[in-house]
Amino acid sequence: MNLKIAAIRENGANERRVALVPDVAVRIKRLGCDVALEAGAGIASSYPDSAYKDVSIEADKKMLLSSANILLAVEPPSVEIVQAMKPGAILISFVYGRNNTALVRALRDGKITGFAMEQIPRISRAQAMDALSSQATLAGYYSVLLGAVHMPKILPMMTTAVGSLRAAQVLIMGLGVAGLQALATAHRLGAVTEGYDVRPETRDEAHSLGSKFVETGVDATGQGGYARELTADEKAKVRAVLSDHIARSDLIVTTAAVPGRKAPRLIDAEQIAKMKPGSVIVDLGAEGGGNCEGTKAGETVQVGPATIVGPVNLPSCLAEQASELYSKNILNLLQQIIKDGKLTLDMTDEVVAKTLVTHDGKITSEAVRQVIEGPAAVAASAIPSPTAKG
């Protein structure tokens, strides 16, 4: 009997993406699997049921959940959805286990193997599975457009019959995937751009996009592709340099975020007060508490002279292509764990080991387990059991 891979309809209020698009469904079938979709799952992202060829469209969600060997989703599913899955099944979705402990417990207790897409390791061979990066690319692009529509001026220089209009000054803070895409987009739209990141190795990437790089003299390169926490002295040094650049910017996009953790503060109230009238900040860290003082997630607020936009789930605003990229990320993961139509989980494989959050009734992610069971329990389990002597 073939493995059944099913995608569900997302229930989040601001979620329009779907985990499976028609083209990818065809490629999954080539792996020797049956493919099913909850009725209407792709409509919000411009994929009607009729676009899914040779896919079982099922209206009974409970039946779909109980029969699927592998369940695909975008957002962390509810506990109720997990409890409706059959024991031994696999979930592939974003999980954010440190923030969704009830979900992880349900996965553990239901003996569901949970793959957390946000935990895909940042290694070369896993790039095609890196859902955080694929979604961040679209968020970075859209952030500049969002900022532009809130500005009282245009981005490019423009020559008119009555004179020339100056190009806007755009500062991108945080040059990860989202930041670099924002930088490239602002440059293509004609703005004068500069980028800042605490990791000096991003300097060349900024220059390659036609942008200046803000030099602070602080190196905060951390592990896993993310920046480390700055010391108090380093923060003061960085602030002194950045304040001038912030004050002269027309548009700032902040992108500093680490999945599942509080967003670092990049801009404070004093710096905002010295910004130009009509200036705009788009804070991509809004869901994690904000990179800017005064940011409100899901709202646009006026703070002194500046408008602060705190968008949530920007990839969902570009649902058609966000779904396409995410679905391809999942396909590449499935190709790692399905061979000749059979499930083959290699626990020694770095991608599998680091992406798993639960398996066989256990929490396999140490970081998540520490939050749920406590550091003492994790440490105790690492101590070998004493061996009886004859």
Model segments located where?
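Rossmann-fold NAD(P)-binding glycine/threonine-rich loop
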Residues: R98-S124, K262-L314
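An N-terminal-biased, well-structured beta-alpha scaffold segment characteristic
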Residues: N2-A106
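A structured beta-alpha segment of the ubiquitous adenosine-cofactor-binding alpha/beta core
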Residues: V55-N69, P76-P77, Q223-I252, A256-A273, ...
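Glycine/serine-rich phosphate-binding loop and adjoining beta1-alpha1 elements at the start
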Residues: N2-K4, E10, V79-Q169
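Adenosine-phosphate binding glycine-rich loop
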Residues: E118-Q119, S124-A161, A286, C292-P386
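Glycine/threonine-rich flexible loop motifs
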Residues: N14-A19, E80-M85, S93, G225, ...
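Generic hydrophobic/aromatic pocket-lining and core-packing "Φ" positions
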Residues: A25, D49, V82, V104, ...
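Glycine-rich phosphate/diphosphate-binding loop of Rossmann-like nucleotide-binding domains
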Residues: I8-Y47, P156-A247
